[in-house]
Every structure is written in structure tokens, then in C-alpha cells.
UniProtKB/Swiss-Prot annotation:
Record's compositionally biased regions (Basic and acidic residues): 264-278
Gene: KLF17
Principal localisation: nucleus
Compartments, record wording: Nucleus
Region span, Disordered: 1-48, 239-279, 356-389
Annotated protein name in UniProt: Krueppel-like factor 17
Species per Swiss-Prot/TrEMBL record: Homo sapiens (Human)
């Protein structure tokens, strides 16, 4: 944004008013509104559009290929004959090997602001009063936006409103693109845009960099939310504008990545948790209503002997007919005959054949909660468990 002191803005506004007063007589003689002629030549076909106080008309005429050339801006002196239509403004803009030359014919009472850029760039024209600004490209609908208020041209080349000091339009060297939602109008309709009051001048066109499509193939966004859309109305007197917050249509959605599904093992870890799981005990008993499982095959074989009644391990001691399902049971039985007791109590020197018998005996040496002196001298009362299978 460019700012100027209030005194300079008032001085320039006074100069504009004096210039307009000098040409007021010429304006009274001219009854028709300024005619804006925009033509585009691409070598095949073109459109000639004119705006006046009557209904607009669209005429087709062939283009010529001789219009190719470098950008040129020419403004005739405002002192020529009024009947000729006023100062002539021609602006040939080459783009992609084609030439199109919008021409604006104005009355002498109108103010013309021109901005000449380098050859790769395009020229923009802004008129004071209820004038029209041509922005065109071959085979693309034109945009006509009226603007009211006093304008001035600072040294930097951007037209600035004299009331607020805000630049009216900025552009880059890239080719312009039409606003989203614009459409050509028939001969009985008028394309009308939002008017800007002179008391609050504002930017009427966003920058061309915001209007251009993105260069990145992945960035498919449309122009930002401040881009405006125009409504086509049947009446010439109606001026309707959509809210500035409306976003451009047809916003494509970025294809999001596919949701990654994490498959979790619903089965418990083998060897953890309960030991009776089928994974930890692969050897199962097939007898009816049994369902027991074991980690070793030998344990399953000894278990199945209970179902069959087989006792392969028999005692060879004289006059002993005991037999057992497992070999360890037979060895434990032989201690009855040999009186071998490997498990001895360290407090009372008693001996036992099995470790579980020793643990059961050691509980008698521990004082109880009710009678601490109980079971202190009951070592003689304790008798070893009966020998058996």
C-alpha cells in the first residue's frame, strides 16, 4: 500500500476537478456513454463487444494476423474533435503467439491513466468516473468493472485513489485469467459488477499472481476467498455483488492417504498367561469327557493308563503286590520297604520320605495366632504318614 500526505492528495484532487470543469462543455455535447471496444485476434475468429447506453451487442468478425507486435500504448490529445469519439487508446498485447488489441474510445471529459510495463508484461488502464476497465484474453469472457472516485498516478506507476491513497490494481507479467463463475451474456442482458463509492475506494481487482493457477501439480487450489464473483442481471439498473467471503467453485479434494490398519494378534502369547492353553499343551487326551492336555507325550501316555487301567510298574519286594502307573511312584514306594527318609527336619531331627510331608511337619513348629505355646512339644505326637502308594 502506498500513502501520500493529505495536502498532496487534496492538491491533485483539485487539479482533476479543474481539468474536468474545462471539458464540461464537450461532455454536454456528447450524449452517449463511453464506448469500450475490445477485440482479440487469434488468427481464426474473434469477438467485438461494445458498451453504450443502450443494450450491449456482440458481433463476430474475422481477425487479422498482422496485429502481432510488441505492446504499444498510445493516447491521443484530448483536444481533438468531439464527433470523432474522443481520445483513442490502443493496447496490443501478444500472448502465446497471438495478438489482441483492446481499444477504449473515450470522450475528452474522461481521465485516462496508463501504465506501461516491460514487453513481457501487460498494460492496465483505469479511468476516473463511471468508466470501464478492460481485462481480456483471447476466447475468454471480458470483465467490466465500473469504478468511481478521484484517481492519481504516483511515480511508481500504480494508480492510487486520491481520497484514501490505496492502490487500485496490481498485476504481474503473467497472463490474466477470468474470475470463477463469469459467463458471457446475451444481447438483452448486461454484465454488471460491484461499484466502489468514492468515499471508500478499495482494490477492485486482486493481484494476477493470486488469480493464476498454481504451478505445482499437487496444489489444485482455486483463487483465495477474497476473489469476487459477478452476477448477470436482466435489468441495467441493478447492481448486485456476491459476498467477498465466497470461495471459488469446484475445489478439488486432495486424495488422502489410505488409513493404515494395524492388525493386532488377538491370540495370547504362547507360554504366557494360563498354562492350560491348547498352544502351550499340544498333547490332549482324546477320551470322552476328559479334555486334559500335557506338554510332553510321556505325560499323556501315563495319563491314558488311568483310562485303560494298565499298571506296568510293579513292586518286586517280597510279599508286596503293589503296582503303579509311573516309575517315580514305584521308587517312592520302595522307600517304605528300605526305610530310606531323605527329608529331615532341622528343628526336631525327624525324617520323612517325601518333601511334602516335611513341609507339612514344619508348620507345627510355627506359633499359632491364638496359642503361641501350642504345638511346641508335640514332636512325639506327630507320627509319620502311613506308607502307601
Amino acid at each position: 500500500m502506498y500513502g501520500r500526505p493529505q495536502a498532496e492528495m487534496e492538491q491533485e484532487a483539485g487539479e482533476l476537478s479543474r481539468w474536468q470543469a474545462a471539458h464540461q462543455a464537450a461532455q454536454d455535447n456528447e450524449n452517449s456513454a463511453p464506448i469500450l471496444n475490445m477485440s482479440s485476434s487469434s488468427g481464426s475468429s474473434g469477438v467485438h463487444t461494445s458498451w453504450n447506453q443502450g443494450l450491449p451487442s456482440i458481433q463476430h468478425f474475422p481477425h487479422s494476423a498482422e496485429m502481432l507486435g510488441s505492446p504499444l500504448v498510445s493516447v491521443e490529445a484530448p483536444g481533438q474533435n468531439v464527433n470523432e469519439g474522443g481520445p483513442q487508446f490502443s493496447m496490443p498485447l501478444p500472448e502465446r503467439g497471438m495478438s489482441y488489441c483492446p481499444q477504449a474510445t473515450l470522450t475528452p471529459s474522461r481521465m485516462i491513466y496508463c501504465q506501461r510495463m516491460s514487453p513481457p508484461q501487460q498494460e492496465m488502464t483505469i479511468f476516473s468516473g463511471p468508466q470501464l476497465m478492460p481485462v481480456g484474453e483471447p476466447n475468454i469472457p471480458r470483465v467490466a468493472r465500473p469504478f468511481g472516485g478521484n484517481l492519481r498516478m504516483p511515480p511508481n506507476g500504480l494508480p492510487v485513489s486520491a481520497s484514501t491513497g490505496i492502490p487500485i490494481m496490481s498485476h504481474t507479467g503473467n497472463p490474466p485469467v477470468p474470475y470463477p463463475g463469469l459467463s458471457t451474456v446475451p444481447s438483452d442482458e448486461t454484465l454488471l459488477g460491484p461499484t466502489v463509492p468514492s468515499t471508500e475506494a478499495q482494490a477492485v481487482l486482486p493481484s494476477m499472481a493470486q488469480m493464476l493457477p498454481p504451478q505445482d501439480a499437487h496444489d489444485l487450489g482455486m483463487p483465495p476467498a477474497e476473489s469476487q464473483s459477478l452476477l448477470v442481471l436482466g435489468s441495467q439498473d441493478s447492481l448486485v455483488s456476491q459476498p467477498d467471503s465466497q470461495e471459488g467453485p469446484f475445489l478439488p479434494e486432495q486424495p488422502g492417504p489410505a488409513p493404515q490398519t494395524v492388525e493386532k494378534n488377538s491370540r495370547p502369547q504362547e507360554g504366557t498367561g494360563r498354562r492350560g492353553s491348547s498352544e502351550a499343551r499340544p498333547y490332549c487326551c482324546n477320551y470322552e469327557n476328559c479334555g486334559k492336555a500335557y506338554t510332553k507325550r510321556s505325560h499323556l501316555v501315563s495319563h491314558q493308563r488311568k483310562h485303560t487301567g494298565e499298571r506296568p510298574y510293579s513292586c518286586n519286594w517280597e510279599s508286596c503286590s503293589w503296582s503303579f502307573f509311573r516309575s517315580d511312584e514305584l521308587r517312592r514306594h520302595m522307600r517304605v520297604h528300605t526305610r530310606y527318609r531323605p527329608y529331615k527336619c532341622d528343628q526336631c531331627s525327624r525324617e520323612f520320605m517325601r518333601s511334602d510331608h516335611l513341609k507339612q511337619h514344619q508348620k507345627t513348629h510355627r506359633p499359632g495366632p491364638s496359642d503361641p505355646q501350642a504345638n511346641n512339644n508335640n514332636g512325639e505326637q506327630d507320627s509319620p504318614p502311613a506308607a502307601g502308594p
